[in-house]
Design a protein with these regions (language model features):
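Glycine/proline-rich active-site loop of Rossmann-fold NAD(P)-dependent oxidoreductases
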Residues: 147, 160, 172-188
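N-terminal Rossmann-like NAD(P)+-binding domain of SDR-like oxidoreductases, especially those catalyzing
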Residues: 1-172
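A general alpha-helical scaffold signature found inside nucleotide-binding enzyme cores
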Residues: 93-96, 185, 189
Length: 190
């Protein structure tokens, strides 16, 4: 099986790629633009491509070449607090990039698309613990972008049969985390 991991130089992507390579015989293809991750984080054995996911034709060429079975989409610019001030950048990197991947996943009949969304889709209307039945009501552009991608995945399933899984992590930390960005990865700095 061939697995595509976006954000492969970041915390989640690199750790997942390492686990897959250590525990399965699957091949891992990784994409990252290195805006928040480091090449040192990419495990040996990953077929790595450095490019921007806003480039739809480049994604399509990669899908044609490698024919991945599963996509783990972990790439994002996760600066929730900064997102009201970088609206265009936020939507390009968190919404357009994601819809490009979804488009190629439909075209190439991907078996499953796993999307790292965010707890930010719930806004500040609720107190933890959160559950999936709560209404999403994001309050900033980052949460809006993540919510829009979730909705796009639901429609892609209904219209094209693209199977998907959505996870909504929040404030995770660990090995390979970028601790230098003051707008992201708060627990790593704390």
């Amino acid at each position: 099986m061939k697995i595509l991991v976006t954000g492969v130089a970041g915390l989640l992507g690199s750790r997942l790629a390492e686990w897959i390579l250590s525990n399965t015989d699957h091949k891992v293809i990784g994409i990252d633009d290195l805006s928040g991750g480091y090449t040192e984080n990419i495990p040996k054995g990953v077929k790595f491509y450095k490019f921007d996911l806003k480039n739809l034709s480049r994604i399509d060429k990669l899908f044609n070449k490698h024919k991945p079975d599963i996509v783990y989409h972990f790439a994002a610019y996760a600066a929730e607090g900064l997102s009201p001030f970088i609206r265009k950048y936020n939507y390009e990197n968190n919404l357009i990039s994601s819809t490009n991947l979804i488009t190629c996943s439909i075209k190439h009949d991907i078996k499953r698309f796993v999307f790292a969304s965010s707890m930010s889709v719930y806004g500040n209307k609720y107190e933890p613990p959160f559950h999936e039945d709560l209404q999403q009501c994001p309050i900033d552009p980052y949460g809006v972008a993540k919510f829009a991608v979730e909705q796009d995945l639901k429609i892609a399933y209904e219209q094209h049969g693209l199977k998907y899984t959505i996870v909504r992590p929040h404030n995770f930390y660990g090995q390979n985390q970028n601790i230098w960005d003051k707008y992201r990865n708060v627990l790593g700095i704390w």
